Structures are given as C-alpha cells and as structure tokens.
From Swiss-Prot:
Organism: Clostridium novyi (strain NT)
A GO biological-process term: ribosome disassembly
SMART domains: EFG_C (SM00838), EFG_IV (SM00889)
Family: Belongs to the TRAFAC class translation factor GTPase superfamily. Classic translation factor GTPase family. EF-G/EF-2 subfamily.
Domain tr-type G: 8-282
One of the record's GO molecular function terms: GTP binding
Coiled-coil residue windows: none
HAMAP family referenced in this protein's UniProt entry, alphabetically: EF_G_EF_2_B
Keyword list, A-Z: Cytoplasm, Elongation factor, GTP-binding, Nucleotide-binding, Protein biosynthesis
The keyword ATP-binding is annotated on this UniProt entry: no
One Pfam family it belongs to: EFG_IV
InterPro entries referenced in this protein's UniProt entry, alphabetically: EF-G-like_DII (IPR053905), EFG_II (IPR041095), EFG_III (IPR009022), EFG_III/V (IPR035647), EFG_IV (IPR047872), EFG_V (IPR035649), EFG_V-like (IPR000640), G_TR_CS (IPR031157)
Protein's name according to its UniProt entry: Elongation factor G
Length: 687
C-alpha cells in the first residue's frame, strides 16, 4: 500500500499534563472529532478509549502511553498519551524522545502544577516545540489569565495567547480568535457546533490589547515583520500564521489556547492549531546516530533513505504477545522483512505491523518514515533499541533512565506460582526500564525495585491481574548506598601454599573519594604486577564494592589507583589477583571512614494556607529541609528535600492533615550522608 499522506501532512504529537488536568478526556475528544471513536468515553465512568489497562480505568489515571493514529483535514496525526503521575516519568521521557511536538494541558483553576514542571523540563531536554491548552474553563475558579501568568513565572516560557475566553465558569461560552479577530461561540449542548460572530462589545478592548501583545511577541522573532510593524504597516493574517509557525517550531513562542474538553468546547480549534503551528517530521532537525565505526551520521525523514527506527516502548498484549512500539525516522519498514537490531547486533524478523487506535489495531503492510506503529514478532528487541537496514547499520541515540529508589520483597502465595512469577516479572522488567527485579543473595528473597510506591503497587497489581500470580509484598525498603570520606592506601595479599600449585596475588591500592562514576587507574610501573593480571584486580574491587562493610550496601563515589604489588612466577593467577583486589578494597574501606548514604527526594507539597504550619512542622519532623514557599492560586507550595525513608505512606498522612486538600509530588534528587544515630539503626536492622 503506497503512502497515503505526504510527510508534510504528518504530525506526531504528545499530550502531557499534571495528573487530573484533563489529558485523557482531551485525547478522547480529539479521537471523537477525527472520527476514530463513535462514542465518547468518559474518564469518570472508567470508559476512556486511551486508558486501556484495567488499573487505569479503575484509578482514572493514564499509565501506559498508547500511540494512536487519527486524521484531521487531510493530515495524519499520531498521538501519544503520556502519564501525568510522577512515578511514571520514564514513560514521559520515552514518549518525548519520539515526538515532534507536544500539547501541554493546564487546569484553568490551578495553572502550572508540580508535575507540569517536571514534564516541561523533560520536554526542554529534547527541545520539543509546544502549545498550551488551558482546559476546564467551565469549572469553578477557572482563571485563564492567571494560568498564562503561571506559565511565564514557573516555566519561564514565552506564553502567547492566540485566543482569549468569552466568559468563565458556568458562563464560559467560547473564545475570541485573536488572529482573525472573530468570536467563536459554541453550541450549549454538545459544543460540537459553533458560530463565528463579531466580538462582544465588552471584550473588544481586551481583545485589542491581547492581539497587540501577540503581534509584538511574533514580530520580535522575525526581522522583516519587525520593520514592517515599526513602520506602522498592517500585518496580514497569512504573515502572522507563517511567523507564528516558525517561532513555535524554533521554541521561541508557546501559543496558548483555551476550552473545555469535557464540554466539547475548543477541541476543533486546537486540532486546527496543531496543523497550523506544530512541526511535521520535515520541520525538525534530522536524527543523529553513530555508524558501526563510531562516526556520527544523520538520518533524514524520507522513504528513500535506509531504514532507521527506534523501539520506544515494549508492551505485552494478552492476544499477540510482545508488541514493540516503533518510530520510523527514515526509510520504510515492511512486514515479513528482516532488519538489524544494531544495539544487540542481531537480526530480527518483522512479523506483523500494526497501527494502533487506543485499543484496537489495524494491520498494515508497511510503516513509512515519520510514522509510529507497533511490531509483532520481535524476539530480542528492548526499549531504546534501534532497528535498521543491515546494509546501513546505525545506532540512534539511546535513552537514559533513572535508577530505581525504592524496593520491596515479594513472594508468591503458593510454591507452584514461583516459576510463573519469575516469568511475569521478567516480562514487566522488559516493558519498563525503571523497574528492576533481582534475588537477594543473602536472604534468597525476590526483590522488585522502582520509582515510587505507586509504581510498585501497579506492578504488583498487574502481576495479579494479567499474570494471575497472587503474591505477598514486604514493607518498602530504601536503596541505601555506602561511600568513603577519606583517601587511604591499602594492601591486599592472598597467599596459599599447601601442597600442589599455590595461589599468590598481592597489590597495593589507593582508594580516593570521587563524585561520579567508578574509575580504575593502573599506575603500576616496572612490571610489579604483570599487565594481564591488572583487570583481575579491578574486577575483584568492583565485586567487593557491590557489598560495603557497613550494611552490605553497594559502594559508590570512589575511584581506585593501583600503584604497586608483587607476583610469583608459578603461583600467580587471575583468581589470586581478583581475591587480592577484593581484600585490598575491604581493608582500605575500613580505614577510609565509611559512611552510609540515603536517597533524598525533591518534594513539592501544595496545601491551602490554613494547613501550612501543620504540614511544615511535619516535614521538619521527617528530617526535611525546606527550600522555599510560594503562593500559587490560593494555595501555598512548599519545596523541600526529604529522605525517601521518611516519605513512606506520606500520601495518607498529608490527606488526613489537610482534609484531603493537599497534594504532593516527589522525584529523586541525590544521595546524602545519613546522620550517625540513624545510620547505626539502619545498619543494625540490616545485619
């Protein structure tokens, strides 16, 4: 089947927002208008089309980003619905990596909320052009102008309204289009129909003021228009469109629109703006990668280039097994063909290709450059792998994922389910790179680790529902680490001579505190240790560092210099030097003032003014450091750094202290030293 839509008629967009800002509802409405859904799903009823996992429908939050294809005015739009809960930021990172642009949805009552900032920062990292849709204009307390101000203050973004609302709360009727200078009034019932009329008298001055501000912001990004504007010439609608599109794609301007998805107002105009101002795959820089010799290469969005595709998500489907969601950057992927997974250097056969609608799928023969779809039948591909033409290998830049910060022990309720649980956990870990599972060497328990309590709750929930594994879960454990404070020199000597061949390994090392990755420096001169044994010393040290001397936690933030040693012509072996390296490390660590480190979280708590004192007192009692307080939309925002170990069950505490009105979000900040009294307790419990 030939390509249906040319590349310039493609839009790959993400929809991102704070939890509950109305993201899934907005996506639903887009699917409704573009003819993909016949009945609109309501999140309240647990029937939204995009939220297709059972847990999402129950909790009313979006967990897995479903990629959906829809059509509007001769354009193909691929939408990725991203989760808004902070425990799932990896899903957001992954989606942003493969999008060309995004719509940020704000709640008109709250404006920019904590998670909006997190997601916005991630979008900045990938330089994703954005538009803002101020949603829920019909609810009590909705304030469009305050919301726009929060974008400028908190996100430091150049937010430029291209619409302003007519009325608010129950009286919200539509908006003024500042480019056409017309009022758009929606039908009261379903909002599907609307009329373009003259601007109401009482809004004319405001519309003029905001139109002037919009034009000034646009001409600042275009010298020719600036000259025209300064000379007092009229700037045409066409010129505004062209300049605004250019400025949006260059991340110089963020256009702001308004509406209410739930009442169907403003979605058609949002779709028009997506086509008008957001980039097609041709408008964004070509993707860079490296070839097999390590040289940088570019892949352009064209069907004629060799295939270059990125697997950005792996999902397990109950009917077809493993689905790999891919973005085709260049070339064409054919079903039934063979491709190279360049990260693993293995050939893969493309089984079937499907384009996804939220939860039904359409089989296709080919996926073209610029498209998003899913592949069935890949054996070795995991998240972040590149699939390419074997005659033109390339590795597209891979994604970095944060390390898990919280872990729990888990065991099946029956012995029979042990193997089933192992298979299920392996499948879940394949889908989600921030979820790890391993067996504790000392206790033999299976441990699962992730990004937060909700993350692990949902994993356990999925084990029970999708894989029918009933399990018991232990109390959450913090991922402590150990490090050293002083530099020391230490000796490791392993000698065994008792009949037959002996063992002899001997090294001197210097352990040095060092922020950053582990480094090993070979400073041996004069062959005190033969070259072939040096890697064994390094391996011995790295293995010993997996389990520190305080509580058996991994040791981080140090580097090693191996500067002397001795060997025996006959008795020395790699094994002996590995043991010597391990002994030297343990001896050195004991003398280097070892300390315990704990993960500290950056916490943001939003509470009504009257609960401020109570909540701050509670944060202090949790060893929290309060960094600042800012008023926001009638509430106070407390920014603090709090050790993760003190945050377990915090959601319940905050709810009871604020009568359910407080919310919080947290993300990993860094590792910090644990106070001595607490460190002794932690180590005591672990021994």
């Amino acid at each position: 089947m030939a390509r249906q839509y040319p590349l310039n008629k493609f839009r790959n967009i993400g929809i991102m927002a704070h939890i509950d800002a109305g993201k899934t509802t907005s996506t639903e409405r887009i699917l409704f208008y573009t003819g993909k859904t016949h009945k609109i799903g309501e999140t309240h009823e647990g029937a939204a089309t995009m939220d297709w996992m059972v847990q999402e429908q129950e909790r009313g939050i979006t967990i897995t980003s479903a990629a959906t294809t829809c059509f509007w005015k001769d354009h193909q739009i691929n939408i990725i619905d991203t989760p808004g809960h902070v425990d799932f930021t990896v899903e957001v990172e992954r989606s942003l990596r493969v999008l060309d642009s995004a719509i940020t949805i704000l709640d008109a009552k709250g404006g920019v909320e904590p998670q909006t900032e997190t997601v916005w920062r991630q979008a900045d990292k990938y330089q994703v052009p954005r538009m803002i849709f101020v949603n829920k204009m019909d609810i009590l307390g909705a304030d469009f102008y305050m919301s726009v101000q929060t974008v400028r203050d908190r996100l430091r973004a150049n937010a430029v309204p291209i619409q302003i609302p007519i009325g608010k709360e129950d009286d919200y009727a539509g908006h003024v289009d500042l480019i056409k200078m017309k009022a758009v009034i929606f039908d009261k019932e379903l909002g599907v129909n609307y009329d373009e009329v003259e601007i109401p008298e009482d809004l004319k001055d405001k519309a003029e003021e905001y139109r002037s501000a919009m034009i000034e912001a646009i001409v600042e990004t275009d010298e020719e228009l600036m000259m025209k504007y300064l000379e007092g010439e009229e700037i045409s609608e066409e010129e505004i469109h062209t300049a605004l599109r250019k400025a949006t794609i260059a991340n110089e301007i963020v256009p702001v629109l308004c509406g209410t998805a739930y009442k169907n107002k403003g979605i058609q105009h949002l779709l028009d703006a997506v086509l008008a101002y957001l980039p097609s795959p041709l408008d964004i820089p070509s993707i860079k990668g490296v070839d097999e010799d390590g040289n940088e290469v570019e892949r352009h969005a064209s069907d004629d280039e060799p295939l270059g595709a990125l697997a950005f998500k792996i999902a397990t489907d109950p009917f077809v097994g493993k689905l790999a969601f891919v973005r085709i950057y260049s070339g064409v992927m054919h079903s039934g063909s063979y491709v190279l997974n360049s990260n693993k250097n293995k050939k893969e056969r493309i089984g079937r290709l499907v384009k996804m609608h939220a939860n039904h799928r359409e089989e296709v023969e080919e996926l073209y450059a610029g498209e998003l779809g899913a592949v069935i039948g890949l054996k070795n591909t995991t998240t972040g792998d590149t699939l390419c033409d074997e005659n033109a290998p390339v590795i597209l830049e891979s994604m970095e994922f944060p390390e898990p910060v919280i872990s729990v022990a888990i065991e099946p309720k029956t012995k029979a389910a042990q193997e089933k649980m192992g298979i299920a956990l392996a499948k879940l870990a394949e889908e989600d790179p921030t979820f790890k599972t391993y067996t504790d060497q000392e206790t033999g328990q299976v441990i699962i680790a992730g990004m937060g309590e909700l993350h692990l709750e949902i994993i356990v929930d999925r084990l029970q529902r999708e894989f029918k594994v009933e399990c018991n879960v232990g109390a959450p454990q913090v991922a402590y680490k150990e490090t050293i404070k002083n530099a020391v020199k230490a000796e490791g000597k392993f000698v065994r001579q008792s009949g037959g061949r002996g063992q002899y390994g001997h090294c001197w090392i210097e352990l040095i505190p060092h922020e950053g990755e582990y480094e090993f420096e070979n400073a041996i001169v004069g062959g005190a240790i033969p070259r072939e044994y040096i890697p064994a010393v390094d391996n011995g040290i790295q293995e010993a560092a997996q389990s520190g001397i305080l509580g058996g936690y991994p040791v981080i933030n140090f580097k090693v210099k191996c500067y002397d040693g001795s060997y025996h012509d006959v008795d020395s072996s790699e094994m002996a030097f590995k043991v010597a390296g391990s002994m030297a490390f343990k001896n050195g660590m004991a003398k280097a003032t070892p300390v315990l480190l704990e993960p500290v979280m950056k916490v943001e708590i939003v509470v009504p003014e009257e609960y401020m004192g109570d909540v701050m007192g509670d944060v202090n009692s949790r060893r929290g450091r309060i960094e600042g307080m800012n008023p926001r939309g009638g509430a106070q925002v407390i920014a603090a750094f709090v050790p993760l170990s003190e945050m377990f069950g915090y959601a319940t505490v905050l709810r009871s202290r604020t009568q359910g009105r407080g919310t919080y979000s947290m993300e990993f900040a860094n590792y910090e030293e644990v106070p001595k009294s607490i460190a002794e307790k932690v180590v005591g419990e672990n021994k």
